[in-house]
UniProtKB/Swiss-Prot annotation:
Gene this chain is encoded by: TRBV12-4
Coiled-coil portions: none
Protein's name according to its UniProt entry: T cell receptor beta variable 12-4
BP GO terms, sorted: adaptive immune response; cell surface receptor signaling pathway
Summary of subunit composition and partner proteins: Alpha-beta TR is a heterodimer composed of an alpha and beta chain; disulfide-linked. The alpha-beta TR is associated with the transmembrane signaling CD3 coreceptor proteins to form the TR-CD3 (TcR or TCR). The assembly of alpha-beta TR heterodimers with CD3 occurs in the endoplasmic reticulum where a single alpha-beta TR heterodimer associates with one CD3D-CD3E heterodimer, one CD3G-CD3E heterodimer and one CD247 homodimer forming a stable octameric structure. CD3D-CD3E and CD3G-CD3E heterodimers preferentially associate with TR alpha and TR beta chains, respectively.
Cystine pairings recorded for this chain: C42-C111
Residue stretches making up the Ig-like domain: 22-115
Keyword terms, alphabetized: Adaptive immunity, Cell membrane, Disulfide bond, Glycoprotein, Immunity, Immunoglobulin domain, Membrane, Receptor, Signal, T cell receptor
Glycosylation-annotated residues: N90
Function summary: V region of the variable domain of T cell receptor (TR) beta chain that participates in the antigen recognition. Alpha-beta T cell receptors are antigen specific receptors which are essential to the immune response and are present on the cell surface of T lymphocytes. Recognize peptide-major histocompatibility (MH) (pMH) complexes that are displayed by antigen presenting cells (APC), a prerequisite for efficient T cell adaptive immunity against pathogens.
Signal peptide bounds: 1-21
Keyword Protein biosynthesis appears in the UniProt entry: no
Source organism (scientific name): Homo sapiens
Length: 115
């Protein structure tokens, strides 16, 4: 398999492990084959009511994907298509899933929390 083909079937997703606000994300780096599921996890700061998921690409810059208030999704208008989903089952945990992953999903993904 040529390097161009390998590049096209690989997907690189980067997340910030710790932000200045003290939010914890995992995994720090994710490389997957095209078509696989990617799950990103976020632990907001204790006591914060709002959680935000963002995506940053070189071409489009920073984009808000979705945000929650007290575990309830408020605005998900930035979520691309049906392949992306986000949940916040409790105040201390959220996930962002991409399935199936595509090369155009390569980006830096991160979450933030706020009072």
């Amino acid at each position: 398999m040529g390097s161009w083909t390998l590049c096209c079937v690989s997907l690189c997703i980067l997340v910030a492990k710790h932000t200045d606000a003290g939010v914890i994300q995992s995994p720090r780096h994710e490389v997957t084959e095209m078509g696989q599921e990617v799950t990103l996890r976020c632990k907001p700061i204790s006591g914060h009511d709002y959680l935000f998921w963002y995506r940053q690409t070189m071409m489009r810059g920073l984009e808000l994907l979705i945000y929650f208030n007290n575990n309830v999704p408020i605005d998900d208008s930035g979520m691309p298509e049906d392949r992306f989903s986000a949940k916040m089952p409790n105040a201390s945990f959220s996930t962002l899933k991409i399935q199936p992953s595509e090369p155009r999903d390569s980006a830096v993904y991160f979450c933030a929390s706020s009072l």
